[in-house]
Design a protein with these regions (language model features):
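Short, charged recognition helix plus adjacent turn
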Residues: 9, 99-107
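Short alpha-helical DNA-recognition segment
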Residues: 54-74
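N-terminal flexible/basic segments that precede or flank functional cores
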Residues: 1-47
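Alpha-solenoid HEAT/Armadillo repeat architecture
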Residues: 34, 54, 77-80
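Amphipathic alpha-helical interface surfaces
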Residues: 25, 41, 45, 49, ...
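DNA major-groove recognition helix of helix-turn-helix/homeodomain DNA-binding modules
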Residues: 83-101
Length: 107
């Protein structure tokens, strides 16, 4: 019996395709930072947003967010330390928004 081979997609390529879907993006970013201390969560969140922007196209995200492309790259690089205003603009550019909820407390 002949083995059937299926074509596989490299993990990052598949992830970049998934990150074009706003519903997936919300789950991806929320899951990435859930339960982390603030110091870690902020770096991971910015890295995640940068990956989403890359997947959706930095030029397109820059145009939709009203942020110059060069400024977008600078803000989302490692240790870029973007302002809340910049993050809000980028999230607008990738088609999602921030929301808040009451923190669950341990009993």
């Amino acid at each position: 019996m002949k083995k059937r081979r299926t074509k596989s997609v490299p993990h990052e390529k598949g992830l970049l395709e998934d990150l074009k879907d706003p519903e997936f993006v919300v789950h991806f970013l929320s899951s990435a930072i859930e339960g982390l201390p603030a110091e870690e969560a902020s770096d991971i969140l910015v890295d995640g947003i940068a990956l989403v922007a890359k997947a959706q196209g930095m030029t397109r995200v820059a145009e939709r967010s009203g942020i110059m492309r060069e400024s977008l790259y600078r803000a989302l690089k490692k240790r870029g330390n973007p302002t809340l205003s910049t993050l809000h603009g980028v999230l607008e550019g990738i088609g999602i928004e921030m929301s808040f909820r009451v923190k669950k407390r341990a009993r």
